[in-house]
Structures are given as C-alpha cells and as structure tokens.
Amino acid sequence: MKRFACVYVWLLCLVLSIAAQEKVVKLKIVQTSDVHGNYYPYNFITRKDWQGSLARIYAFVEKEREQYKENLILLDNGDILQGQPTAYYYNYIDTVSPHLCAEMMNYMKYDAGNMGNHDVETGRAVFDRWINTCDFPVLGANIIDISTGEPHLPPYKVMERDGVKIVILGMITPAIPAWLSENLWKGLRFDDMEETARKWMKIIREKENPDLMIGLFHAGQEAFKMSGKYNENASLSVAKNVPGFDIVLMGHDHARECKKVMNVAGDSVLVIDPASNGIVLSNIDVTLKLKDGKVRSKDIKGVLTETKDYGISEDFMKNFAPQYDLSLIHI
C-alpha cells in the first residue's frame, strides 16, 4: 500500500511539474482606425442613424472582455479627432471641458493610440490637449521634436499579459508636409517609416526582447512617392522589409484588408486594415504556447468584424448622454 501511495504522489508531482512548465496564453487584439469623429451611432451632418461609431465598437469590446478580461488589448490607429461636428465642438468651441474623445477612449479603456494626419490637422493646441487628457499613450516613433531630435510622443508601449511581453510600435505617414501647413505642426518633423522601423526594431529587440511585436501604423497599403520625397502608405513595405513584426495594423487609406504576407526573413506577418468610421474593426486572436516561461509557438488569426452585428452599448450611451444632448443643441 505504501508503494502505491509513493507512486501516486510521484505521479501527482510529475503532472504538477509539467503543468507548471507548460502554459497556453490567449490574447484578443482589437483595432479601430479612422473613426473620424463617429463617436455616437448618429450622423450629426445628415441627421440620420449611423451604422458605425465608438458606441457600437464598445458593445463588441464589452462582450469580448467577458471572456478575455485583461487579455483583450484595445488599440486605435488615428484619425479620430476630425470628421463629425461632435469632434469639431470639442476641438474648437468647448476647449475648457475634457475632450469628449479622450473621455470616451478612457471609458473604453484603450491601451494605446496612434496619431493620424487628420489628428495633426486639428493643430498642436488641439491634439496636444487631447493627448494630455488620454489615460493611455498616444504613440509616434517618427514624429520628431526638432529642438531635441527625439520623438515628440512615446515611440512604443510595452505590455505584459500572463507572462507574455508585447510591444506596440506606433508611426504615422511622413507625408504630412505635403498636405498640411507647417503652422499646424510647427516644431515637428515626420521621418520615413521604414528607416524609423529599422532603428526602433533594433532598440526594442535589444532592450525589450518581446514575445509579440505589433506595428500600429497610420499608413495605407500601396506605397508610392508623394511630392517626390515622402514614402506614403508604407505599411506593407515595413511589414515585408523590416523583420520582427508579428502583426501590422494599418489605417489611413480607408481600405479593408486582412491577409498574411511573408517578410524578407521568411516569417509570416498578419496585416489588417479596418477601413473607416467604425463600421468594421480588426479582430485578432493570438494563441501562444509557453514552456519554462518562453514562447515556443504563436498562432495568429485575424478577421474584420462588422460592428453593427453587436448593437449599441447602453452603458456607453448612458454615460455620454449629456454630451450627446449638448451636441444636438449646438450643432
């Protein structure tokens, strides 16, 4: 009997030891991009109900957080400050209250944001105020403060979930000077995305050694030279030519995309773009298998999800009802 008891204890210890060494971590990554002021499911320009909006996006996020909890990572890829009159009102009319967009994104618990060209277009007074009100970092590795030569915004964010280290590198299309007057972005410059990605990938690998590397790029898919010198829409170029990215989240061009590409090192990279106005979102499942604390395998799958299929978040609408009513009065 003693022998059987010893064997049982030994087997139990063995099973527990194996269980402690092996682990599966599941992450849900949700990307919004080019929301363009569509905070409510109502178009204040046409005075009609709207199929997109942060209110619909949050209905999806609420549902998914029931399962994933802190393992849901919510990211925005820029161009959120301009498009609907509600955004204009808090950009230029009510400049004393906390910016509505920042309040909404804080309420939704975004983990990181990114700058878009239309966010820059609002002017430094507006976008700096919005950034300073956000409870999460707004990224911009290639937005450089001319006086210091350093990024004006955090270049990347480091997160850890269930022992998995995640790094998100944010960049914007460098073609801002081709569209926007310098008085809107005075004191800044916008560096080439591929050059910036190479620089920061080296730093990130040496300093952070991430298990999952995400690019959050406000740039589209088909690269071309704008005004003869700016590499516009370089997201795919970076995904293919700069090894190290597992996922590249795209925006800016309002074109839906979800596919895998192979980079120059022979590794697969998921590239995904949810187009605009909060009508669809990037919905990514990542499964990582760890052994002895190290990632042994990664499975990454992405789809574009229609937000209309999840209804409207009642909690969101209730929380921001006063601002909605105010918008109806003043717009």
Regions found by a protein language model. Give the residues of each.
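Phosphate-proximal small/polar/acidic motifs at interfaces that engage nucleotide phosphates
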Residues: 14, 319-324
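Conserved small/polar residues in nucleotide/adenosyl-binding loops
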Residues: 329-331
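Acidic, metal/ion-coordinating pockets
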Residues: 21-308
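Bacterial Sec-dependent N-terminal signal peptides
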Residues: 1-23
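Generic hydrophobic, helix-prone segments enriched in Leu/Val/Ile
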Residues: 90, 323-326
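Intrinsically disordered, low-complexity N-terminal regions enriched in serine/proline/glycine
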Residues: 3-7, 109, 323
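Acidic, Ser/Thr/Pro-rich beta/coil linker or hinge segments at domain junctions
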Residues: 307-315
